[in-house]
């Protein structure tokens, strides 16, 4: 007798196959759990079976996590599946619409993990509960792990909690950065210490940029971070994908008076550790070019003392003096005469007369530059750039400069230039060693007097 058969459709066969795979997965999971319980030890990460995490947009879940309500978190997250759910948030952001020709509100979905939310906001108790329920410590939902979020917000207690439970100190984001790269504010110093104690690699370069934590700290003027990384073996000679050393990034990040002081302190740490003051990036832009472009006279003088060359041009043919002249226009609220005098004392050549217009409205800086010439050049290039109210305020200086155009200077001034030429790039150091009265020494170093003689 022929055996009767039942015809299965392709969709039914697929459903049966999926059901069979699900049952096999459940059997393996239960067997692994039973084996774990029998050994009385937690299952290893390799033995843990993975399954797709479910997504959640429930406002109640969002409210509990983002507010740090421990009771609600305990009620909502009672097992491993809940602790590892993917939390989705949707926000409207402005985006340019080429078809409509104007900016429109576009919904953007962001994914993260409950543990990342709790640690980023410093909810230590909530984070501890999620970990005990089985939250994956190094899960990168939305590109970052919980340790990244905690370090970026300088949440010391949460960083310590994660590391205590076994989070990897060198876990990478999707872009290839470590938690140490995200210690970017002064308050994150203690977090950085915890990471290094837990085995974080201080010279690990990040993704395409190839920045190390030392580059990041130097770029933000974090002196204590720089000192910490140097103590743990950070290499001051490592370069980014653009050929920049940590000293380059420290000088490039110095913008504004307060920032200049912070970055100068970080640069000093690097120089004392052996950083090369002449190291240039791919565009031959040296740390001195960066310091001058940001108008940081103190930082520039520090670099010059450590061997930076004041006359070397970058890839565009601009010298540090050219960068300093441009900075006068971009950042007027500083004292450019200090920077100009330092560059001239360390071997910079007098500026081209046509460049004097950049500092025409800074009489003290203009005086320093004019005193670098044996004869005051034509004023046609800069006199028209002087503001009328500024001319009235400093009429004595501007009038004296006009009177000395193409006129012979005093013998004392010519003698000053002769001594400076003899000392060359060692002018500032040499002046302090000469047996001269303080007033004459200051005169040799282009002291501002308020008039041209």
Swiss-Prot record:
SOCS box domain mapped to chain residues: 398-450
Family label: Belongs to the ankyrin SOCS box (ASB) family.
Pathway(s) where this gene product acts: Protein modification; protein ubiquitination
PANTHER family registered for this protein in UniProt: ANK_REP_REGION DOMAIN-CONTAINING PROTEIN (PTHR24136:SF15), SOWAH (DROSOPHILA) HOMOLOG (PTHR24136)
Domain notes: The SOCS box domain mediates the interaction with the Elongin BC complex, an adapter module in different E3 ubiquitin-protein ligase complexes.
Organism: Homo sapiens (Human)
Function description: May be a substrate-recognition component of a SCF-like ECS (Elongin-Cullin-SOCS-box protein) E3 ubiquitin-protein ligase complex which mediates the ubiquitination and subsequent proteasomal degradation of target proteins.
GO biological process, one term: protein ubiquitination
Originating gene: ASB16
Pfam families on file: Ank, Ank_2, SOCS_box
Keywords: ANK repeat, Repeat, Ubl conjugation pathway
InterPro entries: Ankyrin-SOCS_box_domain, Ankyrin_rpt, Ankyrin_rpt-contain_sf, SOCS_box, SOCS_box-like_dom_sf
Any one of the GO CC terms: cytosol
Result when mutating residue 173 to P: Found in a clear cell renal carcinoma case; somatic mutation
Protein's UniProt name: Ankyrin repeat and SOCS box protein 16
